[in-house]
Structures are given as C-alpha cells and as structure tokens.
Design a protein with these regions (language model features):
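Short His-centered aromatic/hydrophobic patch
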Residues: 85-92, 110
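Short hydrophobic beta-strand element within catalytic cores of glycosyltransferases
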Residues: 36, 288-291
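N-terminal strand-loop element at the rim of the active site
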Residues: 5-63, 146, 230-232
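Aromatic "clamp/platform" in nucleotide-sugar-dependent glycosyltransferases that forms part
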Residues: 252, 271
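A short, active-site helix/loop in glycosyltransferases that binds the activated sugar's phosphate group
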Residues: 135-160, 165-171
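Conserved acidic donor-binding segment of nucleotide-sugar-dependent glycosyltransferases
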Residues: 303-314, 322-328
C-alpha cells in the first residue's frame, strides 16, 4: 500500500520525527511511505527520512493554477492508495486534487492550533466543511486541545490520534551515558545544564528562557544548551551574549538523545503547541521538565509530573529558581516516573498503528 505524505520543508520537528519513528512499523504492515515536499527546498531533515525508507518528491509551492496542475499531474501519475496531508498551507487544494484524481482515501492531520480570525476564519470554516462533506476527507487532531479548537472555531469534528515520539529511542540515560554527554558538551560537574529543543520561531519563545537565565543570581553556574535552527538574526545567541549567559547553540541536531542525557532540566516555554513532540521526547528520556502552562502542553498535565510556569521571563526565572533549589535526585525520580507514563501513553506503536488502521479502512469522523 502506497501512502503519500504532503509536508512543507522537512525539518527536525514534530510531523517529520513522527514519520521517521513510524517507518519501521508501517513497513512491517505493508505500507510504503512517500513524501511530497512543498517547501522551497527539501530541508535539512530530508536525508534522515530517506534513510528511514521514504521516497521523496519535490514540488515547491507557488500561488498559481500552474502549480495546482503540476500537483494534479503528479497525483495522477502515481497510484497512491492514501494521501495524508500534514501542512495547513493549501491543505484544501491538496485534498481537492487528491479527490478529483481518484485517490480513494484522503487524511488530513491538524498538527497545530489554527484559531484564525476575521475573513481567514470564515474561509477556513467553509473549506473544512467542504473537505468533510464533499471531498470525504478524514480530519485527525493530534491532541485534545487541537480537537477542541477545531470544533470551537470551525465546527469541524475530528478523530483524535495522539502524537507519538520515538519510544524505542528515547529512554532514561545511564550514569555513564550522562557523564559522557556532559563531557562532550563541555559541561562542568558543578554546572546545571538547561536544555531547549526546537526552531527559534517566536511561538517557541526561547528568548524568554535566555532572559530568565540572564536574571538568575550568580551562585548557580548554568549552561544553556539549545538544539535547533536559529533564524538568520541569531537573536537568542546575541541576547545570551549580552546577558552573560553561558550558552551552547548547537544548530540542527539529528539525534537529541545526547542533549537530553546531558541536561539537568528541559524547558519548553512555548506560547502554544499542538502537541509538543520535544516535550514527549524529553519526558520519555527521563529528564526533569519545566513546561509552559499553555494550550497544547497543558494536555500533558494528567500524565507528566513536572514543573509548570507562565511563559513570561519573570515567571520562568522564578520557576527555574524553584527547580534549582530542590533536591536533584528527587526531581530525577519524579522524571523517571513521568517517563514510564509517557511511554505508556505516547508510544510509536500505539499512534502509528491507529494511522495504519485508518489508511486501510478509510473511515473517519464524519457527521
């Protein structure tokens, strides 16, 4: 069975890491995955997905009828049994083209919170209605918050298949692995390593973490590790330098297990999330975590015993002080308990199996 996944540029973020983690299970169930990349370039994560067994295609997005014609021809030439749309941009048009080209199943995963306003909200309302009623598209929400926002904003019913993380890869590190990782990043034994993971877009709010770290009293020696792409301005790095924060900006990291092994605390200060994969990975790896009490991340409260904060610098600084003042062994024991619950609830087997069943059945939540 051939399944086409449609994404923007491939980066080491949620949907892409989920696809990599699920490739083995899907292959064992006779599902061959291919990816249509619609960004300007394939993206830095493309080689990783190719190694996982995906065949990649590239049609850079353009706002023109000619682009839609190219996508239609591509779909017509390839006999995909299912088309799975992961991007918000042009999702309606991809679903419509898949439908008219005769693809029997169209699945659209909503990976983020899209509470648009004004004219765009009206437009998306109509599009989602047509997707559901006329184009027979199955909508999947990746978290309770996403499912609620889709219903409240667009009256759009959806299945809920939770995001997953690579539960075979992210496990608590041994003492030896932890010591090796800290040496690799040059972290002294007496330092507290605080880690963030993800691109440096405004919604990820990493500037607030840097500001909070810069305001902490100097008795604590803190090393800030960031794995993920910075934007061209390198605003986070420049702020860290101005505020005297000892930082390691690592750029895109294909495998962040080493970052988690070295970390004493993982921080996710996002303004909102669909379902934060990096948080699942860190919690699955047994790292004590400080999460922003915001939509998307809040869905983890029932399963993750961790610290919570408002996403502003002052609140983050106060939460960091609380974490640093606590017994580190007690924090790590709580994190190990959270790791077990995360593995139970967000394993790749659970989520990817539900999608495999959906691909084969073609059924969904339709009124």
């Amino acid at each position: 069975m051939r399944v086409l996944h449609i994404l923007n540029e491939l980066r080491p973020s949620g949907a892409e890491t989920m696809l990599r983690a699920a490739s083995g299970l899907w292959h064992s169930r006779g599902i061959q995955g291919e990816i249509l990349v619609t960004g300007e370039s394939f993206g830095e994560y493309a080689p990783c997905l190719e190694r996982a067994g995906y065949r990649l295609h590239h049609l850079p997005f353009e706002r023109s009828p000619l682009y839609l014609w190219r996508v239609f021809r591509f779909l017509g030439r390839n006999r995909f049994e299912t088309v799975h749309i992961h991007c918000e941009r042009a999702n309606f048009w991809y679903a419509a083209l898949a439908f008219v080209s005769g693809r029997p199943r169209v699945v659209r995963s909503v990976h983020g919170i899209f509470a648009f306003r004004g004219w765009l909200r009206c437009k998306r309302f109509v599009q989602r209605y047509v997707l559901r009623r006329a184009l027979r598209t199955t909508t999947v929400a990746v978290s309770p918050t996403v499912q609620r926002v889709e219903w409240m904003s667009y009256q759009n019913p959806s299945l809920r298949i939770p995001n997953w993380f690579d539960s075979d890869r992210y496990h608590p590190a041994s003492r030896e692995e932890r010591a090796m990782a800290r040496r690799g990043f040059g972290i002294p034994d007496n330092a507290i390593a605080v880690a963030t993971v993800g691109n440096c877009s405004p919604v990820k709010n990493h500037l607030a973490v840097v500001s909070a770290l810069g305001s902490l009293p100097r008795p604590w020696r803190v090393v800030y590790l960031h794995a993920g792409c910075e934007d061209s301005s390198r605003e986070e790095a420049r702020l860290a330098e101005r505020m005297g924060v000892e930082a390691r900006f690592l750029g895109a990291v294909e495998d962040v297990r080493g970052v988690f092994a070295a970390a004493d605390l993982f921080v996710m200060p996002s303004l909102h999330e669909g379902a934060g994969i990096a948080a699942l990975e860190a919690l699955g790896a047994g790292v004590p975590a400080l999460l922003a009490d915001v939509e998307g991340l809040r869905d983890l409260r029932d399963v993750a015993d961790c610290e919570w904060t408002a996403p502003d610098p002052d609140a983050i600084a106060a939460a960091l002080r609380r974490c640093f003042e606590r017994n580190p062994e007690a924090l790590r024991e709580r994190a190990l308990q959270a790791s077990r619950r995360i593995h139970e609830n967000f394993s790749v087997v659970r989520g990817a199996s539900e999608y495999a069943d959906l691909y084969r059945s073609g059924t969904g939540a339709r009124p």
